[in-house]
A protein has these predicted regions:
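NAD(P)H-binding glycine-rich loop region in Rossmannoid oxidoreductase-like domains
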Residues: 48-91
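Amphipathic terminal alpha-helices
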Residues: 293-310
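NAD(P)-dependent short-chain dehydrogenase/reductase
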Residues: 154-205, 212
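Mid/C-terminal beta-alpha module of Rossmann-like enzyme folds, strongest
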Residues: 216, 223-268, 273-274, 308-310
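NAD(P)-cofactor binding segment of oxidoreductase domains
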Residues: 83-118, 155
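N-terminal Rossmann NAD(P)H-binding glycine-rich loop of SDR-like oxidoreductase domains
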Residues: 3-23
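Glycine-rich Rossmann NAD(P)(H)-binding loop
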Residues: 199-204, 229-237, 285
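Active-site "gating" loop of Rossmann-like NAD(P)-dependent oxidoreductase/epimerase domains
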Residues: 75-78, 83, 120-143
Length: 310
């Protein structure tokens, strides 16, 4: 089976490629804009693909004819999407259309070719009035990012492909070169330095370990799943509770953590106050089994230590 991953230089993309290249019977094609930034270079094929370049998307998909595409690439900086709307549309809407169009055209030309598209989406498509949420909840986006991701979902759902949408929440983990921060590393670093941090207590999420999300996406492919699936962590936490758990794990001073309200933080884009997902469907249909948040912190900590010791 050939599985093509978009956004292979990103957090989820890296986890997907490394998991797929270790599995028998799977040929992984990693794609991203620019050069391959993964440290491990063997076990997969790398093909540059800028998803905003319609011609290149068509060429790469025609060349490889993947059995499944896991579309992990996106513009995910919520505030940047609010201020750079054209770039947001190019990445989160137009690129989805290019992938769908190319796969549909290839499917039409070859009746035996039935590719699957696994598309990543977000809890931010909801307005956050309540949670946790199941797959049947009605979207109501509050930001340009959220609107763009919902439009991407609509393109996938109206396609003639076999498709699955993996909605997820607040993904955390580390990339090869540890160049990207996340809420866990941010809290740890500031508390270790004795800095006071303001953390909102009125936003609730089900934080998702990147490895778990990668496993969920791969299960969607292996099970030939169709439809929308919530693929997130299982612990429903406020952001304040989340940061307290980080402090507990590392034995850091929780008195440095100051509760605050979302209204006190000035950001270009609105965030939904309460999301988080009910993941019963993924557990039942796919055998999805995510880590607890504390287990996720432990795994990340072990990964950081192994990189530092090399």
């Amino acid at each position: 089976m050939k599985i093509l991953v978009t956004g292979s230089n990103g957090l989820l993309g890296q986890k997907l490629v490394y998991k797929l290249c270790n599995q028998p019977g799977i040929n992984c094609i990693a794609t991203a804009r620019g050069e391959n930034r993964l440290i491990q270079k063997d076990g997969y094929i790398y093909n540059e693909m800028d998803i905003t370049d319609e011609k290149q998307v068509k060429e790469v998909l025609t060349k490889h004819l993947p059995d499944a595409v896991i579309h992990a690439a996106a513009m995910t900086n919520v505030d940047a999407c609010e201020t750079e709307k054209e770039a947001c549309i190019a990445m989160n809407i137009n690129a989805v259309r290019y992938i769908v169009d190319a796969l549909e055209e290839l499917q039409q030309k070859n009746k035996d070719y039935k590719p699957q598209l696994v598309h990543l989406s977000t809890d931010f498509i909801f307005d956050g009035t309540h949670g946790p949420l199941d797959e049947n909840e009605k979207p109501n986006p509050l930001s340009y990012y959220a609107w763009s991701k919902l439009e991407g979902e609509k393109i996938v759902q109206s396609s003639k492909l076999r498709w699955a949408i993996a909605r997820t929440v607040l993904v955390y983990g580390i990339v090869d070169n540890m160049s990207r921060s996340n809420i866990v590393l941010w809290a740890k670093q500031n508390l270790e330095q004795g800095k006071t941090i303001n953390v909102v207590d009125d936003q609730f999420r089900t934080p998702t370990l990147a490895e778990d999300l990668a496993d969920g996406c791969i299960l969607l492919v292996k099970k030939k799943a169709q439809g929308i699936y919530n693929v997130s962590g299982k612990d429903f936490l406020s952001i304040l509770e989340l940061v307290h758990q980080v402090a507990d794990y590392y034995g850091l001073d929780k008195s440095l953590i100051k509760p605050s309200k979302s209204a006190d933080i000035k950001q270009p884009a609105k965030r939904p106050p309460i999301t988080g997902f009910i993941i019963d469907k993924a557990i039942k249909d796919l055998g999805y089994n995510p880590h607890s948040f504390m287990e996720g912190i432990k795994l990340m900590d072990e990964q950081v230590k192994s990189r530092v010791s090399k």
